[in-house]
């Protein structure tokens, strides 16, 4: 059995760790509210852009934007992967990466090549290590991400798709469901899915200047950027939620460990006292 001093040192060490996990839990709890507000604020814009694209696509029946055309054969697939910059978020990033590797392998088994661009330090580090063909990366996105920081990596994929180098693009991120649940999501980004039935058959009374095709050309890139930005906000909210839950679990485990160590310490102290009394009694009897 360890000595009382050693056990006391272990208890002190765990208590210090608990202070850190509690602080991280409280910080994440504070940040998640702000992240949720940003996420909810941007949703109406993304939804409105989706409706506009549906109007324009239907209004310009004689013109098909390249982003709306399905390729007959998929020879190369691109993934835009969104992760966090920091760890201590449970299995949030690793679960996403594991599913993505499975999806990439499925495409490779069909004979398709795979390209990736990563957003976030964790994704960049992971996929460089597994030697995936990375064609772009951006890190240090922060808790309040800016759209401007994403435009470069988004353009890499859009240009490759427009030039016919990539036949399909997926957006991979953690969708925020609630504080306890975050879901790894794979959304097809390009070609854009067909307009919903109610959008496609609605009677829109709009005038387009100079024409629907020209407006569609300008709006389409903004729409793709808004989808990626919305996914990034969802991922940031998911990160804070996962970290809050992970740190609470760590704090609970620290409490349990401290209790167990305290019990061991009490037993060791009791044994030492018993031994000391026995020695005193034995010495007195010898006299």
Swiss-Prot record:
Disulfide bonds: none annotated. GO terms for cellular component: plasma membrane; proton-transporting ATP synthase complex. It comes from the Bacteria. GO terms for molecular function: ATP binding; proton-transporting ATP synthase activity, rotational mechanism. SUPFAM superfamilies: ATP synthase (F1-ATPase), gamma subunit (SSF52943). It is a peripheral membrane protein. InterPro entries: ATP_synth_F1_ATPase_gsu (IPR035968), ATP_synth_F1_gsu (IPR000131), ATP_synth_F1_gsu_CS (IPR023632). It is found in: Cell inner membrane. Keywords: ATP synthesis, Cell inner membrane, Cell membrane, CF(1), Hydrogen ion transport, Ion transport, Membrane, Transport. F-type ATPases have 2 components, CF(1) - the catalytic core - and CF(0) - the membrane proton channel. CF(1) has five subunits: alpha(3), beta(3), gamma(1), delta(1), epsilon(1). CF(0) has three main subunits: a, b and c. Produces ATP from ADP in the presence of a proton gradient across the membrane. The gamma chain is believed to be important in regulating ATPase activity and the flow of protons through the CF(0) complex. Belongs to the ATPase gamma chain family. This is ATP synthase gamma chain.
């Amino acid at each position: 059995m360890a000595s009382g001093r050693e056990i006391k040192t272990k208890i002190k060490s765990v208590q210090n760790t608990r202070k850190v996990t509690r602080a991280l839990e409280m910080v994440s709890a504070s940040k998640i509210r702000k992240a949720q507000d940003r996420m909810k604020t941007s949703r109406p814009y993304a939804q409105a852009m989706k409706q506009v694209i549906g109007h324009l696509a239907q209004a310009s029946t004689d013109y098909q934007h390249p982003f709306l055309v399905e390729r007959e054969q998929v020879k190369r697939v691109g993934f835009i992967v969104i992760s966090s910059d920091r760890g201590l978020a449970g299995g949030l990033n690793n679960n996403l990466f594991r599913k993505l590797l499975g999806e990439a392998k499925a495409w490779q088994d069909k004979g398709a090549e795979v390209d990736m661009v990563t957003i976030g330090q964790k994704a960049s580090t992971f996929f460089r290590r597994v030697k995936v063909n990375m064609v772009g990366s951006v890190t240090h996105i922060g808790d309040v991400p800016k759209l401007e920081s994403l435009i470069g990596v988004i353009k890499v994929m859009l240009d490759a798709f427009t030039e016919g180098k990539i036949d399909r693009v997926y957006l991979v991120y953690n969708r925020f469901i609630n504080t306890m649940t975050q879901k790894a999501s794979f959304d097809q980004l390009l070609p854009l899915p067909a307009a919903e039935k109610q959008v496609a058959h609605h009677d829109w009374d709009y005038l387009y200047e100079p024409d629907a095709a020209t407006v569609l050309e300008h709006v389409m890139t903004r729409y793709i950027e808004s989808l990626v930005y919305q996914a990034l906000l969802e991922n940031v909210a998911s990160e804070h939620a996962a970290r809050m839950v992970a740190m609470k679990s760590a704090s609970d485990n620290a409490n349990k460990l401290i209790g167990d160590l305290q019990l061991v310490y009490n037993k060791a102290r009791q044994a030492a006292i018993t031994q000391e009394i026995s020695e005193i009694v034995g010495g007195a009897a010898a006299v």
